[in-house]
Amino acid sequence: MNNIKFLLSANNLFNLPKDNGLEIAFFGRSNSGKSKAINALFDKKKISISSKKPGRTNFINVFIMNKKLRIIDLPGFGYSKISKKKSKIKYLLDDYFKSRKSLKILIILEDIRRSVSEFNEKLIYLSFNLKIPVLILLSKSDKINFEKRKKKLSLFKKYIEKTTHTKNIYIEVLTFSSISRDGILFTKKILNKWTNIKLFKLN
């Protein structure tokens, strides 16, 4: 079912499609590999195009799979060159998360070589309150060796367990690489399960 195509870009919620159906949103700070992850998951070379300068993709990009299922590529930030725009992007994201009823799954990408960013932690807590399933992809896992990947995954899982032990929410953490394709199959399986539809054809 991974027949996906670009629909529109929006810098406010009023320009988004009607708030119905199901939306899977991808979020990651600048240079987290978010666009490459979307391309890899949906087997498209350039369905999601990353900006040449990190943090310059300031719009919500919407991709459609059918009339009721959309993929949302959210803007990321984190670089000083766009500090004046940070507040505008943050308000846009806050409005989307708090008011978008069709948002059903949040996928957060975090460079495996870094720690969880403060903003991403806030996103996770927000997702708890909204009861949205969260999938954390520790991206660029090909950049470190197997032992370091294993250790980092364990650290993230312990953090999640500590944070979510009293919360009733689905949350998963995987290592991921669009280069080595680490985690792609598991990600597809999880999304098939959480959406309760055959989003991806699995061999």
Swiss-Prot record:
Database matches in Gene3D superfamilies: P-loop containing nucleotide triphosphate hydrolases
Q: Output the PROSITE patterns linked to this UniProt entry.
A: G_ENGB
What GO MF terms are annotated?
Answer: GTP binding; metal ion binding
Q: Does the keyword Ligase apply?
A: no
Q: Which keywords annotate this record?
A: Cell cycle, Cell division, GTP-binding, Magnesium, Metal-binding, Nucleotide-binding, Septation
Q: Which residues form the EngB-type G domain?
A: 20-197
Specify whether rRNA-binding is a keyword of the entry: no
Q: Give the superkingdom in one word.
A: Bacteria
Which prosthetic group or cofactor does it need?
Answer: Mg(2+)
Q: Name one Pfam family in it.
A: MMR_HSR1
Which BP terms in the Gene Ontology apply to this protein? division septum assembly
Cellular component, GO annotation: cytosol
By its UniProt entry, which HAMAP family does this protein fall under? GTPase_EngB
The record's family statement is: Belongs to the TRAFAC class TrmE-Era-EngA-EngB-Septin-like GTPase superfamily. EngB GTPase family.
Protein name, UniProt field: Probable GTP-binding protein EngB
Q: Which organism is it from?
A: Wigglesworthia glossinidia brevipalpis
Q: What is the lineage of its organism?
A: Bacteria, Pseudomonadati, Pseudomonadota, Gammaproteobacteria, Enterobacterales
